[in-house]
Amino acid sequence: MNNRIIFATGNAGKIKEIQMIMADTGMEVLSMKEAGISIDVEENGNTYEENALIKARAVAAQTDCLVMADDSGLEIDYLNKEPGIYSARYLGEDTSYRIKNQNLIDRLEGVPDEKRTARFVCAIAAILPNGQELTARATIEGRIGYEEKGENGFGYDPIFYVPQFGKTTAELSEEEKNQVSHRGKALEIMKEELKKYEGNHC
């Protein structure tokens, strides 16, 4: 029996982050590509949890392994929690994050620090080989910066300022990011849940 998790993503940066967080479980984290699964899933849910489950169910139909998926987004309070669940599709899926980030900075022009509050939200879904579904959610609070800073992250990381570290999530070391990241927190919650179902994987 292989202790494998197939994570429903093709994002190499995300897989690297997940592998680090899950390293102490002894389970091998594979991307869809590494598992030989190629599907295109329409994320049409109304919540992060629904979108994560849609992805996980689609991949689970192709394998007998434990499958996990996530959906995450950036919520900016001043912009009525935009881009929210549409974060990946904001301004179009093929639009670079440099353009997306600059657009959000431009929309917040003249807005003072105290009104630039924002959070990253992450929901993780897991589907066990027996079909049981689990979800976990976590957030990280911060605010939107005035320019992109940092090279360590991806997506909206360069504009998301974390007050407790005094820098953006793209400026954090991998260790620092895993301490506070929304995905890291959600994975820790999910890891605790999965301990109840040890052995229920491929």
Where are these regions (language model features)?
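Anionic-ligand binding patches
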Residues: N2-I6, A12-C202
